[in-house]
């Protein structure tokens, strides 16, 4: 199979990568009614499979799970998750032939084999759903012409899809219809119903394309969402311990600090996050973030270029064929880092303390969000898509780190995201360790920022505030956050 994106003309590529329209609430007035009474079979019961299925069932849809015979016979985790939550579970042959919609929520690396196995079993005129377009765009999967192919892509790990739904909210979601497979012209009705059933319409839905989703999703998860947070955690912890900070406190400051800091980001963007700092600390964090952007822009650019060209996908699929040799090696190395093995902290850290003692973390988040947004927009991805991939999903990933550190993050994200995360972090960590960290002291990570005076130059502060508030990610973010009127604070203190 050939990379689908690379078979398109330049004009078609630009058209597909630039597809993005923020949908109005009124477009979801019928909720998920289009799928009610239809038989939906989810293939796979991992993080996305289980949690989307739970939301869909709670929204009134008929959901069952199709698993491989071996998974059922051996009562593997996927079988235990589905059956333990009261779902009907059967084999492909038992469930697929009667399904109106088959929702493929298996890991990316399994998509080709799964689709080849289920497609002959699907009835005439059925629909096939994805939550990530890698199989269609990067692998070039060919789908039977009578089958409608849609996407419903929540912009966060599966666990957060469920948690936000239970809070009465949802997560921003991209929907798309594969232009080669919409024979009955019902693709958008199906995709909209899926977004409503999983809770996405409560947080904002973008009408997108398979291409735009893949190219922006890969960039976001590799850089700010996972790679920058892993780099910040590893570097920040090592620096604090080297400078005499209690290892238990250092671990907690990062583990829970990322969540607290990015919660401010979620509620009010970079502006709100930076406003949580004192004026002297804000100016320092701004200057540090600009320094970080200068250092990291070539790396961000390389990742985006490799994603657009297909080079990233090619090398990752080579690793798949090699038994995930690099992925497993990098996973083991991450598990051996100081941060992952930090002792538990028994004290209490006030929520404001995460900001006061974590100026370095704030600067890393600001730099990562703005760089990822800028580089995506430069590549032709529209600002709305770039915002969701660079800013809104960041706190949702931070929430996973707060649970069980980097291990939890890398467990709940996809293997594709995990591979890209390591690829980025493994380049960013030594770069920053050499060029930046020698200049970082405990006043920037570990202890309160202590300026010689709380006084600041008014013109400097005005210029800093102007630069923060007029950045593109803040302009589009202010509009999109206006849709999220039901957001609930989830962080207080530890």
Swiss-Prot record:
Domain of life: Bacteria
PROSITE patterns hit by this protein: KARI_C, KARI_N
Keywords, ordered alphabetically: Amino-acid biosynthesis, Branched-chain amino acid biosynthesis, Magnesium, Metal-binding, NADP, Oxidoreductase, Repeat
Pathway membership: Amino-acid biosynthesis; L-isoleucine biosynthesis; L-isoleucine from 2-oxobutanoate: step 2/4; Amino-acid biosynthesis; L-valine biosynthesis; L-valine from pyruvate: step 2/4
Binding site for Mg(2+) 2: 217, 389, 393
Gene Ontology terms for molecular function: ketol-acid reductoisomerase activity; magnesium ion binding
Entry GO CC: cytosol
Sequence positions that bind Mg(2+) 1: 217, 221
Binding-site residues for substrate, renumbered to this chain: 414
InterPro entries: 6-PGluconate_DH-like_C_sf, 6PGD_dom2, KARI, KARI_C, KARI_N, NAD(P)-bd_dom_sf
Enzyme Commission code(s) on record: 1.1.1.86
Note describing how the cofactor binds: Binds 2 magnesium ions per subunit.
Enzyme class name: oxidoreductase
Residue positions binding NADP(+): 45-48, 68, 76, 78, 108-110, 158
Catalytic reaction(s) noted: (2R)-2,3-dihydroxy-3-methylbutanoate + NADP(+) = (2S)-2-acetolactate + NADPH + H(+); (2R,3R)-2,3-dihydroxy-3-methylpentanoate + NADP(+) = (S)-2-ethyl-2-hydroxy-3-oxobutanoate + NADPH + H(+)
Domain KARI N-terminal Rossmann: 14-208
Sequence similarity: Belongs to the ketol-acid reductoisomerase family.
Functional note: Involved in the biosynthesis of branched-chain amino acids (BCAA). Catalyzes an alkyl-migration followed by a ketol-acid reduction of (S)-2-acetolactate (S2AL) to yield (R)-2,3-dihydroxy-isovalerate. In the isomerase reaction, S2AL is rearranged via a Mg-dependent methyl migration to produce 3-hydroxy-3-methyl-2-ketobutyrate (HMKB). In the reductase reaction, this 2-ketoacid undergoes a metal-dependent reduction by NADPH to yield (R)-2,3-dihydroxy-isovalerate.
Identification of the protein by name: Ketol-acid reductoisomerase (NADP(+))
Organism: Pseudoalteromonas atlantica (strain T6c / ATCC BAA-1087)
Gene: ilvC
